[in-house]
Amino acid sequence: MGPADLQPQLDPTHIAVIRYPAQWLPPASDVSGFFAMVRAEHEVTVVAAEALLEQPEWAATAIEIDRAWRRVTFPGPLPWELVGFLADVATRLAGAQIPFTSMSGFTTDHVLVRAAQADLAVTVLSGESPPDQRPGTNP
């Protein structure tokens, strides 16, 4: 099973990756849509819709904000025994010079790609050739 078998889906929402201090706690506010949080020894990272940053309690304590990401989802459920899936994703995106980061939910995998390359990412992950590599096109 590869990425093209799962029909990758592009979410229209622009995503931000936000870094907070290690001791930071999320504010008690309404969060809707895609949201992920990772706490490590030295930082807390939140991945969420850029619109979340319109709430001052989310933006004020951020150390660093990296905007303009889009999320490509591989709808699951993906079996836990699946081997090489993200390696296939990485190979396809690398072949098109598209940087990415990945994250997984319980049944679904996601990759974040730069918004400017999101449509191209879906094209290559769907098993199609990038436009400049299709027969009859000029590079």
Please annotate each region the language model reported.
Residues 43-48, 108-114:
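A generic structural motif
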